[in-house]
């Protein structure tokens, strides 16, 4: 069995109510708008401190806990026509503290928790690298200078290529300077959440929930 995972418009319309909803979406242009032949808009989301509670280096799946209100915020992004795409630095891979399989389990938990409230992310991009070498237990193949680790824009640029995204019509939302710098480098609008810092024209919000309520 094969599965084609797509952010395009796919809905079961096997009941009268669902059929009516699909017809409405078709009339409103939502079906054609989600076709990847057309330019897409995205909200790029940092993970730690933006979606889940910040605990420093998250090494254990039991440490993963969504910030209250995140499910509702992601639902609003899903309904808005924007793609919801996670872009996260995960140096715990390079440090040898979390395996790729364990990271996948953490992200599976995140998607399951979101799904319980009807929310979803369209894609997850992560950078496993870290430039500093010489630590016990590290994985040398990931101890490199890369193009994907924020504040570099590599993950956003890759997503833009994969999903035909217009970066100038998209947002980078995160809780730290590296998120904002990556968004600026990619040509996105930027929003800082949960921080008292200020970066030029970057908009500040208490949380992702406040961002979507005010900007979408």
Locate each region found by the language model.
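Conserved alpha/beta core of the MobA/IspD/sugar-nucleotide pyrophosphorylase nucleotidyltransferase superfamily
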Residues: 1-38
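Generic beta-sheet signal
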Residues: 4, 87, 127, 173, ...
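Active-site neighborhood of HAD-like aspartate-dependent phosphohydrolases
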Residues: 39-84
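Active-site flanking residues adjacent to catalytic metal/cofactor-binding acidic residues
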Residues: 45-47, 88, 174-175
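Metal-dependent phosphoesterase signature
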Residues: 52-68, 93-101, 116-117, 139-147
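Substrate-recognition element of Asp-dependent hydrolases with the DxDx(T/V) motif
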Residues: 70, 74-110, 120-133, 183
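Asp-based, Mg2+/Mn2+-dependent phosphohydrolase catalytic module
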Residues: 101-122, 132-134, 139-172, 176-216
């Amino acid at each position: 069995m094969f599965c084609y995972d797509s952010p395009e418009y796919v809905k079961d319309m096997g009941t009268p109510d669902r059929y009516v909803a699909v017809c409405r979406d078709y009339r409103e242009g939502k079906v054609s708008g989600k076709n990847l032949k057309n330019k897409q808009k995205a909200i790029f989301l940092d993970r730690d401190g933006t979606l889940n509670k910040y605990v420093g280096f998250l090494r254990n799946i039991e440490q993963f806990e969504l910030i209250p209100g995140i499910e509702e915020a992601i639902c609003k992004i899903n309904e808005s026509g924007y793609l919801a795409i996670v872009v996260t630095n995960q140096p715990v891979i390079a440090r040898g503290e979390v395996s790729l399989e364990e990271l996948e389990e953490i992200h599976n938990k995140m998607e399951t928790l979101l799904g319980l409230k009807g929310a979803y992310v369209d894609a997850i991009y992560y950078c496993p690298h870290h430039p500093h070498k010489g630590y016990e237990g590290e994985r040398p193949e990931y101890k490199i200078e890369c193009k994907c680790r924020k504040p570099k824009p590599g993950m956003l640029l890759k997503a833009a290529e994969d999903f035909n995204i217009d970066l100038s019509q998209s947002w980078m939302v995160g809780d730290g300077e590296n998120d904002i710098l990556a968004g600026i480098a990619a040509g996105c609008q930027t929003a800082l959440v949960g921080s008292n810092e200020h970066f030029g024209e970057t908009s500040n919000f208490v949380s992702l929930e406040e961002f979507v309520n005010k900007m979408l």
